[in-house]
């Protein structure tokens, strides 16, 4: 395509304003240098993957799920549990409302760490208390059983690739520590014409709920219904996901170097750092990527039917 690429590192941050585009391929987090690089690109109108807004949203599961809720994206029934409300009565109520087992997630989780399945009140209390050492809020979801997850890669609202993550028999996650050993999912790339259209449609819908960048959308199917499990910025591209998509990197480069990415970069650079895209009880938390919805009522386990 006539483009060249060079690797840059934290010491090269001063080069960013002179770049035509920035493609981040390191673990992203609002608390590390990848976010600084993304923000600098945003400030100078340099097209960037991943953009700082996407990093903020996807780094906080509560923030991410609220973006999906706002757009009515299909997802498991979900509640946000506040630290000071945790007790046996509430734990039992969660099982009544969401079923058994439940999945608990600490909001800053990544790579399936701090995601656990619980099947009793005592187990829920034990895991929740451990997660509450890291966050004042945790995510509680109904458990969706499936043999594999669809991973739909999306860029600018369009399909980039699709694959299946075959879940290891020892766990319910795509990656887990089992008896001191890490087990990983198998990856099966699936040609676009063999992916159910509704899977692609839901993946693109979920990506659009977050932004216009590049995302990996995890989807489960159960009893004929599809559920978005999460949306990831900075999705994996080196595990064979693109085996049937030889033009994947061409699409990424084309996006970065065309008007769509440039327009999005300009749009982001014109936003104030604390945007108020969400007006409601979680407004500031959703906009800044912080799980701190302090305005919620005292006795509330925040329902998935949040009024925006």
Where is each model-derived feature located?
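Short, hydrophobic alpha-helical segments
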Residues: 256-264
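Glycine/Thr-rich phosphate-binding loops of Rossmann-like dinucleotide-binding domains
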Residues: 31-32, 112, 225
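ATP-binding N-terminal substructure of ATP-dependent carboxylate-amine bond-forming enzymes
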Residues: 1-49, 305
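Short glycine-rich anion-binding loops that position phosphate/pyrophosphate groups of nucleotides
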Residues: 27-29, 108-109, 234
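Hydrophobic residue at the +6 position relative to the catalytic HRD Asp in the kinase catalytic loop
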Residues: 217-219
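Active-site nucleotide/adenylate-binding loops and adjacent lid/helix of ATP-dependent enzymes
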Residues: 16, 41-45, 53-150, 193-201, ...
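ATP-dependent carboxylate/phosphate-activation module, predominantly the ATP-grasp catalytic core
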Residues: 119-132, 137, 141-209, 221, ...
